[in-house]
């Protein structure tokens, strides 16, 4: 149970660029504007994930998972990208923390020296951008932890930002008709 534990979120900057190395050879040319210190016409070898490569998200995830495992977390078998940290010094393991990973964003809750040490390990391995506690946005949801440690989650800002879609009365009556090309483009 994660009662009375501070919630937090963090963002790993340039996540795809810190993923595992590729297991194949990938080459590219520098941009037309050039790169400092790279001769025009050079051929560059990409050794790690890069934005746009199909395996970049997987390479990042594997690196992040390895780092969390090294920090002492265990990946839940029933919910991949959900990690728990147990103190196994007692006869029964005691849950001291949890972390959920979604691409380069993490939401976590935990307490105590073991949890803090694990989080410091994670912070030492990645460039952390924004890290917030108490009230923050995670995956488009506003998360607010109250002083009694209860948690409120809503999507008020997301709903307010939605654009109203006006559908003509005659079109509403054709609810089983396929979308027109204009409708596909507009919505």
How would you describe each model-predicted region?
Residues 1-187:
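Long, low-complexity, charge-biased intrinsically disordered regions
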């Amino acid at each position: 149970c994660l009662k009375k534990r501070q919630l937090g979120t963090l963002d790993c900057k340039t996540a795809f660029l810190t993923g595992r190395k590729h297991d194949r050879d990938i080459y590219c040319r520098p941009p037309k504007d050039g790169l400092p210190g790279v001769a025009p016409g050079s051929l560059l070898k990409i050794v790690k994930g890069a934005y746009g490569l199909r395996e970049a998200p997987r390479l990042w995830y594997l690196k992040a998972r390895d780092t969390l495992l090294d920090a002492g977390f265990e990946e839940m078998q029933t919910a991949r990208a959900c990690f728990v940290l147990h103190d196994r010094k007692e006869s029964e393991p005691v849950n001291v923390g949890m972390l959920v990973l979604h691409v380069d964003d993490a939401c976590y809750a935990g307490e105590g020296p073991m949890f803090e040490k694990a989080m410091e390990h994670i912070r030492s391995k990645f460039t952390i951008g924004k890290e917030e506690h108490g009230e923050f946005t995670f995956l488009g949801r506003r998360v607010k932890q109250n002083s009694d440690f209860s948690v409120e989650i809503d999507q008020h800002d997301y709903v307010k930002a939605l654009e109203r879609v006006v559908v003509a009365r005659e079109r509403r009556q054709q609810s089983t008709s396929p979308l027109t090309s204009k409708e596909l483009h507009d919505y």
